[in-house]
Design a protein with these regions (language model features):
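Histidine- and/or cysteine-centered catalytic micro-motif in compact active-site loops
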Residues: 41, 158-160, 200-202, 229-231, ...
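Oxyanion-binding "anion nests"
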Residues: 190-234, 240
């Protein structure tokens, strides 16, 4: 199937946290398409979502074959459902957003500012693309900007509820309401999300995936030590990064700030101004505060994880549609 400059597009998982952001960005960035079809699981079907100011009905995806007439399909759905669709090879080019929590496999993982147009052009026959975890995107972008390809880097990611999707968002809101009413009751295997920060095996596995993704995105990466924790924030995430100062960076630290300032997707915070996760919600940019020392550079990064994931997925579609009138 060929891809025209105005492809037929499907979004699977349209009612989810990332799916909603994806639909909003398609309109905001003026992505030209001939058709936009919204799908969800049976639980999300028959809901309506706002698409370019128009209320659109979301249909249930009965089977992967429902996607056969589309050129591009965004898989903003849980990993098992995405894997089922990919295995079925229904026809369109598939952009797998569920890959963000896994180490890179045999599917090309690409990201804006990190994958060159030349490298992307070599993937024109690919039928599936994967996006990295937003934390991997932020970390790799920062390291590339600073030329930190060696040495040691320590990072701690703090993920808001939206990083886990709409179900986690809903659970966090419900738990917080119950806690404030002093009536929260948890099952034995249920973790308290409201007013609590925690790290489980899931967060540890995500940290392992992020480390592998950064190595893939950079080709040459420093030694990384990454931890991931869940924090009681609904939207947005944060990342602290401590970097052994690359030898090429000298002086009082202004060189590091300027390198980050010109990096794609990064917005430097005003010096002395407080910077919280809430400041990044709804933004496409990664907002960064920089602190420099004689032998190290420390970054405090805040970003809208759902929006950044959607932006990376849409960039793939934009690149596919613009690289040629038709792509085989």
């Amino acid at each position: 199937m060929s891809i025209s400059r105005e492809p037929r597009v499907a979004v699977v998982g349209a009612t989810g946290a990332v799916g909603n952001q994806l639909i909003e960005l398609i309109a905001a960035r003026g992505f030209q398409l001939s058709e936009l079809k919204l799908f969800a699981t049976e639980a999300g079907a028959m809901q309506t979502v706002d698409a370019a100011g128009e209320e659109r009905l979301v249909d249930a995806l009965a089977s992967p074959a429902d996607l056969r007439d589309f050129n591009i399909a965004f898989l903003a759905c849980p990993a098992p459902r995405a894997a089922e669709i990919i295995a079925a090879q229904p026809g369109p080019i598939l952009i797998d957003l569920s890959a963000a929590d896994r180490p890179p496999a045999d599917v090309p993982m690409v990201a804006p500012g990190l994958t060159s147009r030349e490298a992307f052009a070599q993937l024109r026959n690919a039928k599936v693309f994967a996006i990295p975890h937003p934390v991997a995107h932020v970390l790799a972008t920062s390291l590339k900007a600073l030329g930190a390809y060696s040495g040691f880097v320590a990072a701690t990611a703090m993920l808001g509820a939206s990083a886990g999707g709409r179900d986690v968002l809903t659970a966090s809101v419900d738990q917080t309401t119950d806690l404030l009413s002093a009536r929260l009751e948890l099952d034995d295997d249920e973790v308290q999300r409201g007013f609590n920060a925690f790290m489980r095996e899931h967060e540890r596995s995500v940290a392992t995936a992020i480390s592998a993704q950064v190595a893939t995105l950079l080709d040459k990466a420093p030694t990384l030590s990454i931890q991931v924790a869940a924090i009681p924030v609904l939207h947005g995430s944060a990342l602290t990064v401590d970097i052994q100062r690359p030898r090429a960076l000298k002086g009082n630290g202004e060189d590091a700030v300027e390198l980050l300032r010109v990096a794609p997707g990064i917005l430097i915070a005003e010096e002395g101004e407080p910077l919280g996760v809430i400041d990044a919600v709804g933004q496409e940019a990664i907002v960064v505060s920089v602190e420099t020392r004689a032998d190290s550079i420390s970054l405090w990064c805040v970003f809208d994880n759902a929006r950044l994931a959607a932006l990376g997925a849409l960039w793939i579609a934009e690149t596919l549609a613009l690289s040629s009138p038709t792509l085989a």
